[in-house]
């Protein structure tokens, strides 16, 4: 009897856990006896993955936090590589977390193990030369966005576009009434969803100016309601505390704060104000006009001005290769500017923009879990 296939895999954060879980489920469906092990989160484990270490060890953000956790991270890397030396996988797939995974991939590739990297680092936007490091680490890159292909072709690095799991999960025509019922919002209400980010620092920076924007809109259009979905219980407490300090804003303005319902809030809304990031992709897939904003520290902004090469910083504009949504940075992020742009969406026919969002949704809807699993199997037997 032939021995089961062994697949090594590492996801370093919750987004990677969600992304990898569907691929793990698909691989287990095709090869029920396959041993898929490494580091993963609860979604991967539910799909049949064996996690050797707690994913939380790798889930750290920011330079200072990473430095504080570095000894623990290096210890995990050493133990993981020792495990794979004793139990060599037939193929290894690093899911995002490039700082950790590219090092693991390079070490395994040097031992003759096939390696893949799922989710391209942002080489198309800045530090393009990182692609040489990727080429040394991975036999093939699996990417989420079609515009990435160009830079990999330029350096002759094998790349497969697999689409985005979020595009598979969200309906082409999301049900606004169902989302409104879920959140207790009237079917005929005018609604602005406000998403100031999922990290403490983002909320701290953006919520004050977002609240000023809400107040500016309320002066002109008192019939508009505001939904603020908090990413988790920590952000919920942070948002509620800020609104209370801001002259009890939740009571004096038509604001509803919820937790863990960002997609419902997006679908329930007519227009969205949000922090730039993956949320802009989700808003696009929900077919809602949006204004995206971001504030960087002056030093970070100066550095990024020199290093950042892409023409846009929001995913809808990068995917469309033109400015289809307003993306605002630094001094552009002010209440007057944002309230005017948002009110313009409320008072305009947005059907052409929605049609563009729909086209882009179809581009990304490729059954990513199956496509990624197929690419892994093809590489495994190549």
Swiss-Prot record:
Pathway assigned to this chain's UniProt record: Bacterial outer membrane biogenesis; LPS lipid A biosynthesis
Annotated InterPro entries: Glyco_trans_19 (IPR003835)
Disulfide pairs here are none
Q: Which residues form a coiled coil?
A: none
One GO term of the biological process aspect: lipid A biosynthetic process
Question: Transferase: is it a keyword of this entry?
Answer: yes
Which SUPFAM superfamilies would you find in this protein's record?
UDP-Glycosyltransferase/glycogen phosphorylase
Mind telling me which residue stretches traverse the membrane in this protein?
A: none
Q: Which UniProt keywords apply?
A: Glycosyltransferase, Lipid A biosynthesis, Lipid biosynthesis, Lipid metabolism, Transferase
Give an example GO molecular function.
phospholipid binding
The reaction(s) catalysed by this protein are: a lipid X + a UDP-2-N,3-O-bis[(3R)-3-hydroxyacyl]-alpha-D-glucosamine = a lipid A disaccharide + UDP + H(+)
What cellular component GO annotations does this protein have? membrane
The EC number on file is: 2.4.1.182
- Please give the PANTHER family that the UniProt record associates with this protein: LIPID-A-DISACCHARIDE SYNTHASE, LIPID-A-DISACCHARIDE SYNTHASE, MITOCHONDRIAL-RELATED
Briefly state the protein's biological role. Answer: Condensation of UDP-2,3-diacylglucosamine and 2,3-diacylglucosamine-1-phosphate to form lipid A disaccharide, a precursor of lipid A, a phosphorylated glycolipid that anchors the lipopolysaccharide to the outer membrane of the cell.
Q: Which family does it belong to?
A: Belongs to the LpxB family.
- Identify this protein by name: Lipid-A-disaccharide synthase
Q: Which gene encodes it?
A: lpxB
